[in-house]
Amino acid sequence: MEGKLVGRTALVTGGSRGIGKAIAEGFAKEGAQLVINGRDIKVLEASAQHIRETYGVPVLPIAADVTDEYQVKMMVAEAEAFGPVDVLVNNAGVHIASSFLEYTFMDFKNVIESNVYSVFHVTQAALVNMVKREYGRVINLASTAGKWGSRNQSAYNASKHAVVGITRCLALEMAPHNILVNAICPWVVDTDMAKGFMSEHSKALGVGEEELAEKMNASTPLGRLIKPREVAGLAVYLASDDASYINGQAWTVDGGYTMI
């Protein structure tokens, strides 16, 4: 089999749906064997079977809560036994929109734990063996929300700024070990999570979901949301040897939104 990732094993958190699933399929298309993580084993197994049948690569589904240090260590150990983890994609996360004054502490804590602590736990566990092997690629899914502020998204924006910060610090620490660390910062991607975001955000702004969707589409030069495969293509590039001199970058994928 030919492909840019033949002989590599990739671990993708949140890999059973949305952006994570698209990235997993992009990796599989290039020949990587996969470990996909999520919380729902039935959804994971269905996604794994689809990838096996479509691309003919080995796929190991592992259900684990990536905010739980013990579960993460067990997951990474199982992934390493399946095939040394060469590429890690931290994609798992949540989004809760609310005005700052109405945010509950538990909701704020949930966002930070899901979007930041998960990156800490999974990356730290995976890096141990990457350092021993003197090779690795870490790709963190951040967001354009990790580059500026926006209304009703204080927790989410804070979490994604943290992910970008972790990415840049690790890029410096891990470079001597031939481990590259980069982030992808998409605008709104057309996924189920985005639909939930639109619903929450429309309520927080006091406008209808359809009206908000029209405004969002009109706010970007391309006039539409991002397709998951458009994020996956960049992840494939960053995981490959084509990107062997790219490190510590937070790649914006927004159709030109930030130019306006």
What annotation goes with each model-predicted range?
Residues T123, S159, T167:
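Active-site helix of classical SDR
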Residues I41-K42, A63-M75, F105:
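The beta1-alpha1 cofactor-binding region of Rossmann-like NAD(H)/NADP(H)-dependent oxidoreductases
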Residues S99-F100, T104-I112, M216:
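Substrate-binding pocket helix/loop in short-chain dehydrogenase/reductase
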Residues F120, L127, Y135, L222-V253, ...:
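C-terminal substrate-recognition "lid" of short-chain dehydrogenase/reductases
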Residues S143:
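Residue(s) in the substrate-gating loop at a strand-loop-helix junction
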Residues A175, L180, I246-G248:
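Short, small/polar-rich loop/turn modules that mediate ligand/substrate recognition or access, typified
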Residues T9, S16-R17:
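Conserved glycine-rich cofactor-binding loop
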